[in-house]
Design a protein with these regions (language model features):
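RNase H-like nuclease fold core
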Residues: 31, 92-135
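Acidic, metal-ion-coordinating active-site neighborhood of RNase H-like domains
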Residues: 66, 93-102, 220, 224-227
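Beta-strand-rich binding-surface signature
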Residues: 3, 32, 76, 90-91, ...
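Retroviral integrase
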Residues: 39, 95, 169-172
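C-terminal reverse transcriptase regions that engage the nucleic-acid substrate
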Residues: 1-78, 214
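Conserved pre-motif C helix in the palm subdomain of viral-like polymerases
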Residues: 19-44, 97-100, 108, 135-154
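RNase H-like nuclease module associated with reverse transcription
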Residues: 52, 87-89, 125-271
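Structured nucleic-acid-interacting core domains from mobile-element enzymes and related host factors
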Residues: 69-94, 163
Length: 271
């Protein structure tokens, strides 16, 4: 997906026929169901492709086929929660891709909560408004991650497992951490006032604790943008998907029976 360039179809031209649109939307729905349940590794790709559901072009269908090639190849992947004598306390990694979409320059929020070394809650979504700086995009992402952290704490308490310490949130943005801690506040951040005080409230009430992490170690990076081959493999290994380890590379598209079936369906709908 890193090399696939997707742009909206110019209006009012309609390249896709109704059968293609229906097939595309059905496939996106299936991929989204899988992504929400057990596959954070495809979250960004699914979100990106879903933006073109109303009028997919052949480029979008080709990218969708590539996504399903990967899904078929990694069908045995799954989340593994390994029993530990000293269970790991949940942590969160949060990241943002600033103005990554050239069509509207809206940034993407990505966060992942992990326990026992395995994800259990994640999100990859476009932000509601255009951020005017990297710090603003990262801070908006941290705001949504902190809201989810608060909900996780409340849910855990309701089922009888209250947290005994703040939930740790890791970000690779020093500017964002400075804003959240109150050491970097001036006129340029005034419009972030509501989010600013809500995150500080969570910190002051010991619901969350904010930490810095290097960008190359941020596990939420895969949720915000397409990654190069090596980086993508590293991120998937972080998520503890495969019992036997992550292979060097996926097979050529169309090698398996499942992939051939997906390919033939796409070709039939296109004809």
């Amino acid at each position: 997906m890193a090399t696939v360039k997707l742009v909206p179809n110019p209006e009012p031209k309609k390249d896709a026929n109704p059968a293609q649109v229906k097939f595309y939307q059905t496939c996106i729905g299936m991929a989204m169901w899988l992504m929400l349940g057990t596959r954070p590794d495809i979250a960004f790709a699914v979100g990106k492709l879903a933006r073109f559901s109303s009028n997919p072009s052949q480029d979008h269908l080709n990218a969708l086929k590539r996504l399903f090639d990967y899904i078929c190849w990694s069908a045995d992947f799954g989340l593994r929660f390994i029993k530990q004598d000293n269970p790991e306390f949940p942590i969160c990694h949060v990241d943002a891709d600033f103005a990554g979409d050239p069509s509207d320059r809206i940034s993407v929020t990505g966060y992942v909560f992990m326990s026992f070394g395995t994800p259990f809650s994640w999100s990859s979504k476009k932000q509601p408004v255009v951020a005017t700086s990297t710090a603003e995009a990262e801070y908006t992402a941290m705001f949504y991650a902190s809201q989810q952290a608060f909900w996780i704490r409340q849910f855990s308490q309701e089922i009888g497992f209250p947290f005994t310490k703040p939930l740790e949130i890791f970000s690779d943005s020093q500017a964002t951490l400075s804003i959240a801690s109150g050491t970097h506040t001036h006129g340029k951040t005034k419009h972030l006032d509501v989010k600013l005080h809500k995150i500080r409230e969570y910190v002051n009430t010991k619901h969350i604790n904010l930490n810095f992490i290097r960008g190359e170690d941020n596990k939420a990076d895969i949720l915000t943008k397409p990654l190069a081959h090596k980086q993508f493999h590293k991120a998937v290994e972080w998520f503890s998907f495969s019992v036997d380890g992550y292979p060097d590379s996926p097979p050529d598209p169309g090698n398996s029976a499942e992939e051939q079936e997906v390919s033939s369906q796409l070709l039939e709908e296109d004809s």
